UniProtKB/Swiss-Prot annotation:
InterPro entries: L6_membrane (IPR008661). Signal peptide: none annotated. GO terms for cellular component: lysosomal membrane; membrane; plasma membrane. Glycans are attached at N120, N137, N154. This is Transmembrane 4 L6 family member 5. Belongs to the L6 tetraspanin family. Interacts with MTOR; the interaction is positively regulated by arginine and is negatively regulated by leucine. Interacts with SLC38A9. Interacts with SLC7A1; the interaction is negatively regulated by arginine. Interacts with CASTOR1; the interaction is positively regulated by leucine and is negatively regulated by arginine. It comes from Bos taurus. One of its GO terms (molecular function) is arginine binding.
Length: 196
């Protein structure tokens, strides 16, 4: 596969993943679809905006850059086999890789610690000391009185962020290697076009 075609495929995969992360993080801000608890009772991992910033915006840029690097075109005055766009894609992919790692680490921590909720009359991270074992014991989830169903909400959305960021790490890594090859060797489409 040409570096250009690979870049386009990776970019078209990264863009929807970044949008999924942005939407998931936005939903984490409104537990159970209500804004009643948004001001004072959201967990730190929600406020760190890992899905919006890390898995979202920091991955959206390399996605767009990879799509552009996969397109035909010249940069500057003469054609350079798309090497300039590939070079930009190398840097963007490195930034996207860091963003996806940030999203993975914050979301994984959010899953391990659990949500901040009202239990036994106090707002706290009641599952923090369980080291994530609450994830397997669904009977504990109902112990949180407010926000209603917050554990299910957080587990679902943080799991989605973890899965999306793992895919983003993989795709950004592939694009980092692919774009580096594209910078060094150029795009093979020019060679294919001349042989036909």
């Amino acid at each position: 596969m040409c570096t250009g075609k690979c870049a386009r495929f990776v970019g078209l995969s990264l863009i929807p993943l970044s949008l999924v992360c942005i939407v998931a993080n936005a939903l984490l801000l409104v537990p159970n679809g209500q804004t009643t608890w948004t001001k004072d009772h959201l967990s730190l991992q929600v406020w760190l905006m890992a899905g919006f910033v890390g898995g979202g915006l920091m991955v959206l840029c390399p996605g767009i850059s990879a799509v552009r690097a996969g397109g035909k075109g010249c940069c500057g005055a003469g054609c350079c086999g798309n090497r300039c766009r590939m070079l930009r894609s190398v840097f963007c992919s490195a930034i996207g890789l860091l963003g996806a790692i940030y999203c993975l680490s914050v979301s994984g921590t959010g899953l391990r610690i659990g949500p901040q909720c009202l239990m036994n009359g106090s707002w706290d991270y009641h599952f923090q000391d369980t080291a994530g074992s609450y994830l397997l014991n669904r009977t504990q989830w109902n112990l949180c009185v407010e926000p209603p169903d917050v554990v299910l909400w957080n587990v679902t959305l943080f799991s989605l962020l973890v899965a999306a960021s793992c895919l983003e790490i993989l795709l950004c890594g592939v694009q980092l290697v692919n774009a580096s090859i594209g910078v060094l060797c150029g795009d093979c489409r020019k060679k294919q076009g001349s042989s036909q």
